[in-house]
From Swiss-Prot:
Signal peptide per UniProt: none
Residues annotated to bind Mg(2+) 2: D83, D87
Name of the protein: (+)-caryolan-1-ol synthase
Cofactor(s) listed: Mg(2+); Mn(2+)
Chain's role: Sesquiterpene cyclase that first catalyzes the cyclization of farnesyl diphosphate (FPP) to the bicyclic sesquiterpene (+)-beta-caryophyllene intermediate, and then its conversion to (+)-caryolan-1-ol via a second cyclization and the addition of a water molecule.
GO biological process: sesquiterpene biosynthetic process; sesquiterpenoid biosynthetic process
Residue positions binding Mg(2+) 1: D83, D87
EC number: 4.2.1.138, 4.2.3.89
Annotated metabolic or biological route of this protein: Secondary metabolite biosynthesis; terpenoid biosynthesis
Disruption phenotype: Cells lacking this gene do not produce (+)-caryolan-1-ol.
GO molecular function: hydrolase activity, acting on acid carbon-carbon bonds, in ketonic substances; magnesium ion binding; manganese ion binding; sesquiterpene synthase activity
Species this protein is from: Streptomyces griseus subsp. griseus (strain JCM 4626 / CBS 651.72 / NBRC 13350 / KCC S-0626 / ISP 5235)
Induction and repression of expression: Expressed under the control of A-factor (2-isocapryloyl-3R-hydroxymethyl-gamma-butyrolactone), in an AdpA-dependent manner.
Key words, A-Z: Hydrolase, Lyase, Magnesium, Manganese, Metal-binding
Length: 335
């Protein structure tokens, strides 16, 4: 039974719908996992079923081709496996084990020969995704993916040292740890665009990207707080508000809801400022079209992420956390 009542969240963006190929992409994801040898333990399988990666990807990319939807869902399936290994399993409680595992994943992403199912799955996803993309896109995607992976090591070290980040430090950390930025890169694939470095360097585009990512991170923290509290996981914005202010759990959740509304306003402000910067810089042609597409689609992305957290049992059923089976989650990095 939940100990908190979620506040009435402010959500100014309309839903873009859900991809009709959701069931097909779910089937494709599980078939892909089996083909890659990603042998999930019984509790890990139950958790992945509750997580519903196919729902998130279908709400985020409702207009994608089925091939893109399947590929992106397989990325998300793999990312959730990584997340559960390092958040819930022993690999995330041993900094040395964590460092070795993350370094290997980053090396494989950079072209090293893979060993084991998780590394082979990553190499396959990388090849299918990055082939034919521009150098600037590949640089951004590599940066975002590696930065996300290394956040698990940072958290493992802080846990081992008995440290808790400040709220300001955590906000910066969460921008990478929520793993939204790589999916903003994937958005370019399904949108048929490829932003030049000049567009990626626009202050308002950076602000828009950060606001979209920050919204996802805080929404996730609010909706996963009870699950993470049961596991003793401290890297959560709601928990940090509670510690910082000495407030009750409900007061911390309410404050986080207010902050979430402010981030939605940041998204809207960044949209307006990006249009102003496009005009001021004299940007036209395909680059202008691509940036305008980002403005339009990012609204639906924020809304889709928001709707997902209200529907997936990973977040709506904290009572299903299996405390006595945490060690069985880590088969790939704790050997």
């Amino acid at each position: 039974m939940s100990q908190i009542t979620l506040p009435a969240f402010h959500m100014p963006f309309q839903s873009a719908g859900c991809h009709p190929g959701l069931a097909e992409t779910r089937e494709a994801a599980w078939e892909w996992a089996a083909a890659e040898g990603l042998d999930l333990s019984v509790p890990a399988r139950r958790k992945m079923i509750r997580t519903r990666p196919e729902l998130w990807i279908s709400l985020i990319f409702p207009q994608a081709t089925q091939a893109h939807l399947d590929l992106f869902c397989q990325w998300l399936f793999w990312a959730f496996l990584v997340d559960d290994e390092f958040d819930d399993g022993p690999a995330g409680r041993d900094p040395l084990m964590c460092e070795r595992a993350i370094a290997r994943l980053v090396d494989v992403f950079d072209g090293a020969a893979p060993n084991g199912p998780m590394e082979r799955a990553l190499a396959g996803l990388r090849d299918r995704t990055c082939r034919g993309r521009s150098p600037q896109w590949n640089r951004q995607f590599r940066r975002d993916t590696a930065a996300w992976l290394w956040t698990y090591y940072a958290e493992a070290v802080e846990r081992a040292a008995g440290q808790v980040p400040s709220r300001a430090e955590f906000a910066k950390h969460r921008r990478d740890s929520v793993a939204m930025q790589p999916f903003l890169c994937l958005h370019e694939i399904t949108a048929g665009i490829d932003l030049p470095d000049s567009a990626r360097s626009l202050p308002a585009y950076i602000a828009l990207r950060n606001a979209v990512t920050d919204h996802s991170g805080l929404c996730n923290d609010i909706c996963s707080f009870e699950k993470e509290a049961a596991l003793g996981y401290e890297h959560n914005a709601v928990r940090l508000i509670q510690r910082d202010r000495g407030s009750t759990l409900q007061e911390a959740v309410d404050e986080a809801g207010i902050q979430l509304a402010r981030i939605a306003e940041r998204v809207q402000r960044a949209e307006r400022e990006l249009i102003e910067e496009i005009e001021a810089a004299g940007i036209d042609g395909p680059t202008r079209t691509a940036l305008e597409r980002c403005v339009r689609d990012y609204r639906g992305l924020v809304r889709g992420d928001f709707d997902y957290h209200a529907r997936a049992e990973r977040y709506t059923r904290p009572d299903l956390v299996e405390l006595d089976e945490r060690d069985s989650l880590s088969r790939h990095f704790a050997a």
